[in-house]
Regions:
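One-carbon transfer enzymes
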Residues: 1-162
């Protein structure tokens, strides 16, 4: 993934964990790593693993996901990647977009932070729509939402230190 190249170029440590060893061992290893590194915010982009309630409850309001639709449309278990855009086109909707939400135990069911709409063109394919939603919505709302939540985290830490 290009994120690993970016991390290396920026001198940021990176680790790759895969859920191939099973959900529980994956989540346990991830939790240990996040705590060791004192991570305050987890961003999910293109992450297709559904995290367990046990994991998400350890990180309340600290996991953000970007989903390629305007939730509650075209979301939930099994709705990711091109499937979302195929469903939007099959349904004939005129507008789709992206949603950033907090992650909880319900797939795509957490509190919505930001949404951005993208019009669907008559000649769109799932691939062209996916690209436009990424460029016009996902890549814009995820950094904005992360910035807002980071500011909230900083305020909380400052209040604890006062």
């Amino acid at each position: 993934a290009y994120a690993l190249t970016r991390a290396e170029n920026a001198g940021v440590a990176a680790r790759v964990l895969t859920p191939s060893c099973g959900q529980e061992p994956f989540e346990n290893e991830l939790s240990v790593l996040l705590r060791e590194q004192e991570i305050d915010l987890i961003l999910l982009a293109g992450f297709t693993v559904i995290l367990s309630a046990e994991f998400t409850k350890q990180w309340p309001r600290r996991i953000l996901n970007v989903h390629p639709s305007l939730i509650p449309a075209f979301c939930g278990k099994g709705m990711y990647g091109l499937r979302v855009h195929e469903a939007a086109l099959a349904r004939g909707v005129k507008v789709t977009g992206a949603t950033v939400h907090f992650v909880n135990e319900i797939p795509d069911g957490g509190e919505i932070l930001l949404q951005k709409a993208v019009e669907i063109a008559p000649d769109d394919t799932p691939e062209t729509l996916q690209r436009r939603v990424m460029e016009q919505a996902e890549w814009q709302v995820l950094p904005l939402a992360a910035e807002r939540v980071c500011a909230e985290i900083v305020r909380e830490k400052e209040q604890k230190n006062d």
